Amino acid sequence: MSKKKKTYQNTLSEKEAKKVIAKLADEIRHHQYLYYVKNQPEISDFDFDQLFKRLRDLEEEFPQFKDLNSPTLVVGSDLDKDFEKFQHKLPVLSLINTYNDDELLDWVNKTDPDGLYSVEWKIDGASIVLYYENGMLKNGVTRGSGGIGDDVTDNIRTVRNIPLRLPEPITVYLRGEVFMTFKDFEEFNELSSGKYANPRNLSAGSIKQKNSADTAKRPLRIFTYDATFPGFTKKFKTHQQILSKLEKLTFPVPPDTVFVNGSKIAETIKDFKKKKDTLGFPTDGLVIKLNDISKRDAQGYTSHSPRWARAYKFDAIMKESRIVDITYAVGRTGKITPRVEIEPVNLAGTTVTFATLHNQDYIDELGVGIGAIVRVAKRGEIIPAVEEVITPGKDVFKIPDYCPSCKTKTIKKENLVDLFCPNPDCPDRVKNGIIFYCQRKQMDIEGLGDKQIEFLYDHGYIRSIADLYDLKDQKEKLMEEEGFGEKSLAIIFNGIEHSKQKDFRFLLPSIGLPELGHKVTELLIEHGIDSIDEILSIAKDKKRISSLLEIPGIGPSTIKAFEENFSDKRILKLIARLKNAGLKLKADPIKVSDQQPFAGQSWCVTGSFENFQPRDKAMDLVVYYGGRKVSAVSSKTTHLLAGPGAGSKLEKANELGIVVYNEKQFLDLLKSLKINFKNTI
């Protein structure tokens, strides 16, 4: 690990950020290699998470330096040149880690506060995927890159509690964790002169033995924790049903798994913590998952992990310090987040001077005040969090009744504990909204980073995203400002001008309206609602607004936001200004080629891709060459393009026997058809 780290990414210049991002990416790849391939990690899981999260945050702030091969876009790899490679039938993703109750419960409240969740042990072993066909073990494969793994079937057959033949001729793909009990590890390690560091390293190394006879000598076991049943007539509705089926098929599953309401998770975690030191096997936390499969499908995936699950890690690094001051931050949605300034303390190799406090309920529970002696923990955040008050301070801190940025009275939103500023003209809200609009994954305006936007706002040059398109009129005045030379301004103005050519499918979500992100925008366009004029027309008709509920993926909260957004005079004025500035307020039509190799085919897409961002670019290509794009998998679908993060669409495609392509296979297909996709899209 690097010994010298800056505490906050916003202290970096662009030049420094570029170097730090490249260095972090290399450092993470190095540790992934040591962890997954060599089975000799040099740093703890926690320290690795800090590196990963710092890179992700820096890439978000400086998106111009994010590489398509960034570790944040792919899972770690345990691929080894000594084994045959195996293309996974489903993407094998990792989980987002959380390190405290507050962080976990915040996710629960955002996901489904009243839903049912499974809580199960997170086994600290070696990840494996088992493939059974007609009831027989066909392949045992490491996680690998998430798409391709090492085929270690011969070694896996020696694991003592893996069934080689199932009691019924069923096809099933399972996720599991190969491990050793503490007792078995100690006995084996004693015979090996104590040369192994821990059960996890020994387990991971054991399944990578070149001779399966050597693996057979090692006391390996497995717990299986999830499965997909392609072609199975019974459709599982819950995770609980899947685990029950696994037990009937004689698979070992983690003990103590419970299913509880979201409101009971904190209490359940306490119960698990009481047991963790009495277990006979290694665990480094818990896994919390939504139980309802349909709700999982609605949550979806990122390229790296499912949105419907979290890993809760027990271990955390904590240090004591004294609170010096308490300040606030106001985000683009108006959410007010307090943070404390503390006396400098070294935490996980970083000098820390600030910590978050999350929300007022959390503050009240801890009793936080200036002068308080507190315990601060780094539990997966770049800025650590206050976890405990040892000695109270002067007065318990209260989030102000008025916004610290604009002095508007704060409000609480339904089902949320946080306070919000309701003023759409709040300076901090506006600045953060413009920053969001300019980000790479939004309108991608080169030259306009956080610092430039804050300067332009603070000095009166801009007050909304529409003002960006009049900025050129102030060129002479801007050239007098420090840091805005002719070269810098040329980059900014070119970036602003270039953004006018961005498709409507980027513009609408970039405006930052609640419930109108990229996913909903794509759904609207798929169903013929492809322009702002059409949207405004629907917004005036209650029946047409209600009909949007017929679109899979659009719910009541989206409908409510739709009505509120497009009846707001401020938003209508903004749209008019963007229209006058020459931005595209209608989605680009899909052109059609004379060459029609996809004619008669119906394609669906799921997951994420390196070469097609957004993923609908791949489907635009299919349509351009004669095919049809569909939003859901059905018996009429002929092909599915599936990338990392694929969910129920891939499962259904396998059940229906639909042809499935991964990204490499799709690119090979295009090559065989002599289609240069880069020139086409």
Curated annotation (Swiss-Prot):
GO molecular function: DNA ligase (NAD+) activity; metal ion binding
InterPro entries per record: BRCT_dom, BRCT_dom_sf, DNA_ligase, DNAligase_adenylation, DNAligase_N, NA-bd_OB-fold, NAD_DNA_ligase_OB, RuvA_2-like
EC number(s) reported in the record: 6.5.1.2
Keyword field: DNA damage, DNA repair, DNA replication, Ligase, Magnesium, Manganese, Metal-binding, NAD, Zinc
SMART domains the record matches: BRCT, LIGANc
Active-site residues per Swiss-Prot or TrEMBL entry: K122 (n6-amp-lysine intermediate)
Source superkingdom: Bacteria
Residues given in the record as NAD(+) binding sites: D45, F46, D47, F48, D49, S94, L95, E120, R143, E177, K289, K313
Pfam family, one: Nlig-Ia
Entry keyword DNA damage: yes
HAMAP family assigned: DNA_ligase_A
Protein name in UniProt: DNA ligase
Record organism: Leptospira borgpetersenii serovar Hardjo-bovis (strain JB197)
